[in-house]
Amino acid sequence: MGNTVTCCVSPDASPKAGRDRRVAERGEPYQTQVELQETDPGPHLQHISDRDFPSDFNDECNPSDHPQASTIFLSKSQTDVREKRKSNHINHVSPGQLTKKYSSCSTIFLDDSTVSQPNLRSTIKCVTLAIYYHIKNRDSDRSLDIFDEKLHPLTREEVTDDYCKHDPDHKHIYRFVRTLFSAAQLTAECAIVTLVYLERLLTYAEIDICPSNWKRIVLGAILLASKVWDDQAVWNVDYCQILKDITVEDMNEMERHFLELLQFNINVPASVYAKYYFDLRSLADDNNLSFLLEPLSKERAQKLEAISRLCEDKYKDLSKAAMRRSISADNLVGIRRSNAIIS
């Protein structure tokens, strides 16, 4: 009892010899057991999010995966923005009549674009402007054959030899993307996800978007985003009907390479999506692509509230459906109650 330690020793055996023998018998198996526990982790199923990436791959530097990393298109556009401001300052260019509207205590100006339901036309303009800055301020001309339009033309027209030397302007990129979105009836959210996949491809594959490959890279990103984001059946043959001269086999091969280069990482977290949306708005503000602002009225407030509730109910239904499909014993989010039988 208390601090007293007692032990029992066989009367016909020496205490010291017996103690040494028992220590020797128990010590070695115990050490072996410890070594086995340290070296054998046992059966363990690794989750896809726990995959080991190369040592030089820093997730925090990839804006398409990490919400705190700055988007590539916004950083590439800052060079031109600074040059425009410097040129206006040197040449004493007056901004002229102020067309930007500011809210006051009596009037609030809002546009019809929200993070949950962006304006389609304005979003496509901003996304294509981001692609334009990617091409204009690229670091080099690294590319892959699968995206080379000279090797895989989208039309029957012959591609000129100097095709890779002329950067497309913003209007050219906008017309190409707008045609695809109008024909396929895609949403504005799909345009934002397209830009996320595009920057993820450039980061993962270590390539640049340039005049020789921009159409096929954008087409592959739109194709993948439309299948992942939009809740509708999209087939590669649908895009072949829009782009008359491309074959289904070419579309399938490009999609397969695109997925492999993305390492099949098609996940877009909500925080990353929101970051791209607000950075696109900043890009629009820096380049005078302002959204159409209107005074907030009672009718507009009710409309915005209805849109928010509709999107909220939609996401709740999607999350409930996902929970029903993927619920498991180790992922219980609440207490599950069974119906009581009263007799």
Swiss-Prot record:
Similarity remark: Belongs to the cyclin family. Cyclin Y subfamily.
Any one Gene Ontology cellular component term annotated for this protein: plasma membrane
Keywords for this protein: Cyclin
Family annotation (CDD domains): CYCLIN_CCNY_like (cd20540)
Biased composition (Basic and acidic residues): 17-28
Name used for this protein in its record: Cyclin-Y-like protein 1-B
GO BP of this protein: regulation of canonical Wnt signaling pathway
Molecular function GO labels: protein kinase binding
Matches recorded under InterPro entries: Cyclin-like_dom (IPR013763), Cyclin-like_sf (IPR036915), Cyclin_N (IPR006671), Cyclin_Y (IPR012399)
Start and end residues of each stretch annotated as Disordered: 1-69
Domain Cyclin N-terminal: 145-267
Gene3D superfamilies: Cyclin-like
